Amino acid sequence: MTTKKKAIMGIKIGMTQIFDENDKAVPVSIIEAGPCTVLQKKKVESDGYESIQVGFYNLKEKLANKPARGHFKKANVKPLRYIKEFRIDNVDDYDVGQEITADIFTTGDLVDVIGTSKGKGFAGGVKRHNFARGSMGHGSKYHRRPGSLGAKGPARVFKGRKLPGRLGGERVTVQGLKVVKVYPDRNLILIKGSIPGPKRGFVIIKNSVKEK
């Protein structure tokens, strides 16, 4: 059975724990999901593929540029901060201006959550790549240094070598997370486990590609 594609945008509120029917503590991430507004429909005849363009999170009108204001005006909606496009099975199920709310997901659904990981700044090899430390004795000069960068022959460092650098701040997808609870009236979705990003970080929730 093929699962119908669905997605919604949200803001990470934080984490807490709830108790299930067996009185077992379950760690959950709280996401303020939607409401999202359909801004545009794309079809095979005009665009070569089917998708819907969706906006989320109110934006002051003065912060939207002129082309964006025209786009929102055409859809007859107020300016929105985040705009994403989702491939779906049938665009005819949606209308421009329609709201997508948290109740598209139900308890027990498996979802993939996409977000931007916390930025850690410049980090060394031990923290960034989980390298083993060198000897910590008094005579050692290689406590946390990277070690060899390659053989003498090429006389250069190959691309892709794991070296110190910026850690975090990257797009991360966590797959196969379980929806524990949905509160449609409060636009909240509780998902088991942790999700990428800091508090108030932007996330996208999609039904899991590994859902059976």
From Swiss-Prot:
Gene3D superfamilies per the UniProt record, alphabetical: 3.30.160.810, Translation factors
Family the UniProt entry places it in: Belongs to the universal ribosomal protein uL3 family.
Top-level division of the source organism's lineage: Bacteria
Gene Ontology biological process: translation
Gene Ontology MF terms in the entry: rRNA binding; structural constituent of ribosome
NCBIfam families, per database record: L3_bact
Statement: the UniProt record of this protein carries the keyword Ribonucleoprotein: yes
HAMAP family found in the cross-reference section: Ribosomal_uL3_B
Species per Swiss-Prot/TrEMBL record: Syntrophomonas wolfei subsp. wolfei (strain DSM 2245B / Goettingen)
Pfam family, one: Ribosomal_L3
Keywords from the UniProt entry: Ribonucleoprotein, Ribosomal protein, RNA-binding, rRNA-binding
InterPro entries the UniProt entry points to: Ribosomal_uL3, Ribosomal_uL3_bac/org-type, Ribosomal_uL3_CS, Transl_B-barrel_sf
GO (cellular component) term, any one: cytosolic large ribosomal subunit
Function: One of the primary rRNA binding proteins, it binds directly near the 3'-end of the 23S rRNA, where it nucleates assembly of the 50S subunit.
Name of this chain's protein: Large ribosomal subunit protein uL3
Self-association state and partner proteins as the record states: Part of the 50S ribosomal subunit. Forms a cluster with proteins L14 and L19.
